[in-house]
């Protein structure tokens, strides 16, 4: 029995030794721990990464057995068997091995738990960082401020930079970078932490709110920035700035400096004129294509007048003001709607300039003529398209709806057939209703909205003339004044005309200039007339002098020619090379002219109330009438008149009554229409010495009337010496008849028949700069013979003209006298027309 137990124990121990080898057990435990770590690492990576990788099954590890290990194992087996022979000692050794195995497992488990705790702490630290959607960098959570209006989060650095850019560009409606929700001002203050930027932000918000208030008026003083909210100040428009140290008075209506005793239009015209004078007198200012392009790229907002720069990058013309949010068109500078570019306004969505008036009129006429054909064509295409298209559309929709469903084929076909049949019945009705409603709407738009909108905006080109009926104007494509910029364009055009004037095209440069004419070699009367053009081109000439020929068109037969030289620098105007000077001053609305010493002409541009230039024509006609002058003055030297040679203009005057009478009638009609504007100031009598002097001159001219010599303007001009200036009133019919009676009796004291003349104050010691800017030109010339006693009828005629450049045309037509023994003496006629087209 004992031997059998020992044998069994030995077999059991051998089995235990094989199964409970400490090295193998330790290796297995280590393998288990490694597998566990790898599994935890894999789980960590899978939790951290958003993309899960496919699990790879690890191949089983193969153990290599060496020859030494086999012999060592045999020796250990023998030793263990010997120890087991001791009975109890063998069992104790087995228990010790189990205890050691347990301690090893606990140590391995403790190391695994410590490593797991470290990994969890690292994962917690990684989870505290968030990626910014703007800069794409990872930051901690405390660098992501919370926004009240939305849930999006961005880092504080990106938000601060974003707010700085928005505020510096005066955008106050700042939205979230990731959505359209607006920031709360409290959030902006917390993010910025900058008092200067917050002051700008609040100021821009205040300005944006005040711009929307129609009663808000900003102080026009420079660097003031004070606003006055005035309620009910239309009747009392004088406002005062309330800022300390300013106190500027300005107008409620025009929002400019207060202008006492002036309307807003008059003050605006005066400001524009002064600005124009300063711009033109400064010789250092030059205009080029670059400067013009730059001016076109900067325009004020039509609502808040904030200047806006548009980049020339081919962008559209739909602009939005960043200050007030006004949506306007860059071409017409008017607030617009979504249908602005579809209306006949002439503004294009992508173009750089609007249509010209010619294109608008052609488009309008084409629309009016082609509208019936186009509408009929559209209706003819729409009706069959709707009748056929609606059933096809309905059938396809029903088929797509039943496709993919568990429905019988018979039921689906029945539904499709029913829907198509119903649509075939309904589609003609729908087509008829659509055409019946759409065609009248299109006709009403074409024949109602289009003409009214074009004529209301001035694009139809139809205007009523001065008693001449309706006139259709076609302008050039390049001469388009876009709305709101007329003043600026006019100023630039005048300034450009100053540098490159051309009399041949009927233009005189600048606001100040002078003309000098030489008449010493006038052999024939010129019948050449320079063409007048409203869009006269400028031509660059050498130096500052301009030469041109100005002649009259009184007769077809040419007997004389007058050459005129315009010199801007000298500012002189003489009508005779030998003697006799005529001084032409400026004439304003109140008909005040200044007599100048010498031969000086100050040629200001006359403007009417709307800022347009004036056209002045002076016709001098010899006819028995009184000397009364309409808004003119003459200053002729006595000595120069006395030294003139005997051959005057009355020396050889052929008959030219047809053309001269025509000019005189037109001038008389113009004079009568303007006679209501003159004002009489005072009356005075002509002294006897002046009458005697004029009588002697007339006798001297009448004695040489049969000679045909080179005429001179100085011979026919009486002396008004000592810087006197006579301001004559218009002719009256009663005085004209009485004058004819006195002339028929051969009376030489016709100067005593003068009724009244107006005294001009301050005719001396006046300078060119003090002359008024609104002027007309008038010349007093007296040419008569003693036998016929003709008088010169001076008629000044003013016409409004929209031309930009001043044009000066001087026409001298001399009617030569013919004597016939079988007929009575005919009255000679002298026609002189000075036309200024500006």
Curated annotation (Swiss-Prot):
Metabolic or biological pathway: Protein modification; protein ubiquitination
Binding residue positions for Zn(2+) 3: 219, 224, 241, 246
Binding site for Zn(2+) 5: 301, 304, 321, 324
UniProt keyword Manganese, yes or no: no
Residues the entry annotates as binding Zn(2+) 4: 251, 254, 259, 264
Classification via SMART domains: IBR, RING
Name of protein: E3 ubiquitin-protein ligase RNF19A
